[in-house]
Amino acid sequence: MADAKTFNVNGANYSIIDQTARDNASKAMQDAEYSRLESIGAYPGRDLATVFAEEIKQKANVWEWLRARVRSANYSGIRIGDYIDVVIPQTAQVASQTVRYAVGAIDPYYQCGDTAKGHHIAMVPKSTVAVRGPNAVNDSYIQWRKTADNNGTNEQKCPYLLSQLHEWENEHFLSALPAEVQAAIMPHRVLLEERYSSSGKLTEPSGWSWQDLGKIWSLSEVEVYGLNAWSKPGYGTGFDCQFPIFKQTKDRIHWWLRSVSGSSSSDVCCVGSYGIAYYNSPTYDWVRPRPCFLVG
């Protein structure tokens, strides 16, 4: 009887269910299970191209659909951890690979900035990306910088913007992405740490400034851990906030952050292979990038 929908009395059918109530109850159970899995870091994510296949048919591709959804601030049904697979062909500087880009945060910086930022979704790769060519070390890794120095210069006071990592992200990885992905990306402007003095190397930030990161960028320590572990509070934090996808830092992979260490004139921040907040010399050659972008 649990699946019965009608009774027939003298040839007349009478509904005995409230389908709307059943649908709402089913959705509530699904949402509760999602919340449980998300709270313990066990939500595997869903392929957005499959979940919203019928809706996506109205657009040229899944990325055009996602961008339209974001611009209308329609996030219905989209969950942190849901993903889109991106097939990247081999280029001179990027290895052939499929990168699973997950929803890492929804509108984390909406209306923030010296120019207010519009609606956006931060897309974060589920794992690191393999490098090749002149910038690759140990086959597929990359140095943050070729010198053991985390300071800026008189011309560019922000250390990250001087890094080999940032150059590779915007000059090589961006162009390796399929055209439909590139078309959906919003440039990212942030409040970035400066570290420069004409009198010598610094172990502390010297200030901050609004800077364009371009379309591809590495995460900050705060965006991953929600706090400053090795980077400095204040100038080293800017307007950053933790991305919900990193409430559980269970992954044992080693990857670079854009933050620099607050207790050294040479070290930069990274996520250690034990899942811990860590630091390394920028010349260390066993760390990979985890390049992110905004859709909007």
Regions inferred by a protein language model and the residue ranges of each:
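Short, low-complexity N-terminal tether/leader segments at secretion or assembly junctions of large
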Residues: 1-33
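Collagenous Gly-X-Y triple-helix signature in extracellular proteins
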Residues: 36-296
